[in-house]
């Protein structure tokens, strides 16, 4: 597949799963079972997630995405019970596309911002 076709697969994945909250076609888009589970678990924990694709770049089989997102913690997430607290954060992700499906992934969220916002960790102010 071309870089543009790979970008289209990743854009569709992000738009359908994280923006439209519809994972009914996830098996068409993702061959990696871990990513399918993580994506569906994330949407269940944060069902009102709002996500904006800020940048989408592709070279060969690799597609890079930069997003901004906000959501309310309404379901269990990584063992943390719902807090009802809202967070805003950014993420960058790299996806490998093989045979028209996402086969591997590397995602970097601003986990500290998210965990502080939902109350999973205490905010620590820098010492002076």
Regions found by a protein language model. Give the residues of each.
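C-terminal and inter-domain tail/linker signature
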Residues: 1-128
